[in-house]
Amino acid sequence: MLSPCPILPSAECRDTADTPADPPGRVIPINRRRRRPGDWRPERPRERLLERGPAALTDDELIALLLGTGKPGHDVFVTARALVDQFGTLHGLLEATADDFEAHPGIGPARSARLVAVTEIARRMLVEKAEERMQIDSPGAVEDCLRLKIGTRQYEVFIAVYLDARNRLIDMEEIARGSLTRMAVYPREIVRRAMKHNAAALIVAHNHPSGAVQPSAEDRRLTRVLKDALELVDVRLLDHVVVGVSDTFSFARAGWL
């Protein structure tokens, strides 16, 4: 369960280490007063992170640090809390787009780009770990890895997973990409790439940006043609996985191979 975050004034998240002292005689409202050098308090997220480590911060406090200062009229901690509430978990943020972030009044293009960059780094790290742990004899692990890799793409992507004679991973690469609804895939190119990798078996996958994972008639036709073409060069097609954001469809599991 996510921990609630105390709502602090947005001014407390501003980096003003080089800010000069207030001019004599100038009265500044307390909620606009800037922090001076050395004015560190342990309840401030940035200082607490440096003093105690990142584990001491809640999810929304970590997001608030990424956002930096709040936009005028929008407390950065309230915005961070709204993101956590909307997506439910930090993993849910991996599926968010720039438009999703900018739908929040406290987030503009710069902050949105920062969040997208961080979530993409996190997503790629998860894919790397999933590839390292992937056991080809565990369909669930394979499908999870494929979903992490292409499930959130906003356009169609076709990838191939090359395996050796013991079903160990040789490589995974993108074969083609298309638009939101259409993509050109050439079986002979997949066969050529499989032979170049000296693969004994193959798993192919593509995503449906709509999120619906039910294969189309064209998906089924392509799978039959590809399976026949690979058999001519003694390469086994183990599966064709259709990937959505949160679900997958396996041709092998459905008995369509």
From Swiss-Prot:
Disordered: annotated span: 1-53
Biased composition (Basic and acidic residues): 37-51
Binding site for Zn(2+): H206, H208, D219
Record-linked Gene3D superfamilies: 5' to 3' exonuclease, C-terminal subdomain, Cytidine Deaminase, domain 2
MF terms in GO: metal ion binding; metallopeptidase activity
GO process annotations (BP): proteolysis
Domain MPN: 135-257
Highest taxon above the source species: Bacteria
PROSITE patterns: MPN, UPF0758
SUPFAM superfamilies recorded: JAB1/MPN domain (SSF102712), RuvA domain 2-like (SSF47781)
Alphabetic keyword roster: Hydrolase, Metal-binding, Metalloprotease, Protease, Zinc
Sequence motif: JAMM motif, positions: 206-219
Pfam family, any one: UPF0758_N
Stated family: Belongs to the UPF0758 family.
Protein name: UPF0758 protein Bcen2424_2501
Natural source organism: Burkholderia cenocepacia (strain HI2424)
Lineage: Bacteria, Pseudomonadati, Pseudomonadota, Betaproteobacteria, Burkholderiales
